Amino acid sequence: MAAKEVKFHDHARTRIVQGVNVLADAVKVTLAPRAVMCLIERSFGAPVITKDGVSVAKEIELQDKFENMGAQMVKQVASKTADIAGDGTTTATVLAQAIVQEGMKHVVAGVNPMDLKRGIDKAVATVVDELHKLSKPITTNKEIAQVGSISANSDHPIGKIIADAMDKVGKEGVITVEDGKSLDNELDVVEGMQFDRGYLSPYFINNPEKQTVEFDDPLILLYDKKISSIRDLLPTLENVAKAGKPLLIIAEDLEGEALATLVVNSMRGILKVAAVKAPGFGDRRKAMLEDIAILTGATVISEETGKQLEKASLEDLGRAKRVELQKENTIIIDGAGEQKAIEARVKAIQAQIDESTSDYDREKLQERVAKLSGGVAVIKVGAATEVEMKEKKDRVDDALHATRAAVEEGIVPGGGVALLRARSRIVNLKGDNGDQDAGIRIVLRAIEAPLRAIAANAGDEPSVVINKVLAGSGNFGYNAATGEYADLVETGVVDPTKVTRTALQNAASVASLILTTDASIAELPKEEKAAVPAMPDMGY
């Protein structure tokens, strides 16, 4: 085992905080509509230019082991916020840095870190409760467009195209983002289906950047039983390999030898293949497999209908223009099934809805109708260069997640103002002792940080902006895009409540862990042996 270096108390925390500051300062420059870009070197190809906070955070690895631990902990804040809310990563990072910096002052002064944490938790819970009270439901197409625009760094065309997509496939509909072939953004609505099952093994992933499996023009095998032996699958795999197409297997389960063989073939590039579990359970699973079969023009391989897996032919396999497998979802786009068959299936399910007496069954049947008839909206992002395309796609993804979060929990005034307004609830909040009161004061000060960063990036004096906003009330705040003060909801500067809430909760969680850390352990750097000196010239 390699030797370890151990640091205690302030020596441990100080180095960790230095790492937090390096990452947060790099991410902070991307906050606000007038923020600057961050340029990221790539080991090959052109550098990436981005205003996406989580993209910046993911690139940071520090040489000092203790500083790197601090950076990685704050990176978790950004990643978790992105996973839950889809946006707010920069806000979460800025809040985490502010809580850590304010908290360190108290820890160094001898305040009990555990009571400090309890005070922070109490203040955060109160602020979150107030955010829910400030929240306003989002209903109109215009409001959806406003949320999307703000999240995409005030890019109004992006906000509009997302609002149009939601209008066409519904607020709960499936919307995907792809590279476009022109300079302009385009919106296509294609027949498609999404179900809540993801890839069975991460080794199937062929797009490591998005952590997804993506196949164009695949064949689709549907089987209603468990597959354990590769022998049953071999004839189908050989036929698919000859056809030169990717294969998606949807079955009750895949395990053991069968799954291992598919993974090895996929990793070696012998066959483009991936597998997912069939959606639903019991009779509902069979019905949903039949839905997928009708959508893709496949035949479900089932012993009940006399079909055996080892005798499946290419004619039994379904087809689609594209499939995308995520960790927890699968999307089938533009299946090759006949429109008449799909319409007949929808009518049959609607008849079942009319006859159903169970609210639960009716809800599940309605979900199936939506999956068959709703379609998938595809936003094709246009750009002049590959570098611009990557940056723009990141912003469209952020904006899409933000609008979904807004639909879910509503909106609050943007630009860091909602946190300032919610702060009023904790001004007079008291803890069980003085150390907990110090934790409450940390949050009171830290939730100014996002607005301070926004003002600084826009070239204004943060303290002046904070005081002017606090002098107003309600939705009155600072619009960084114009440099003016106005009703932010009326001018379209809004944030999803879920994004603001999640950013604060995740920031407080990780910052509290850093403040209560009293020892850090890291591997000692390996000593490089000196190279053997070259032989001197012997004069020959």
UniProtKB/Swiss-Prot annotation:
Q: Which UniProt keywords apply?
A: ATP-binding, Chaperone, Cytoplasm, Isomerase, Nucleotide-binding
UniProt: ATP binding residues: 30-33, 51, 87-91, 415, 479-481, 495
Q: What is its main location?
A: cytoplasm
- Enzyme Commission no: 5.6.1.7
Q: Name one GO biological process term.
A: protein refolding
The gene it comes from is groEL
Q: Where in the cell is it found?
A: Cytoplasm
Question: Mind telling me which PANTHER family this protein's record contains?
Answer: 60 KDA HEAT SHOCK PROTEIN, MITOCHONDRIAL
Name listed for the protein in its UniProt record? Chaperonin GroEL
**What does the function comment of this entry state?**
Together with its co-chaperonin GroES, plays an essential role in assisting protein folding. The GroEL-GroES system forms a nano-cage that allows encapsulation of the non-native substrate proteins and provides a physical environment optimized to promote and accelerate protein folding.
Looking at the UniProt entry, the stretches that span the membrane are none
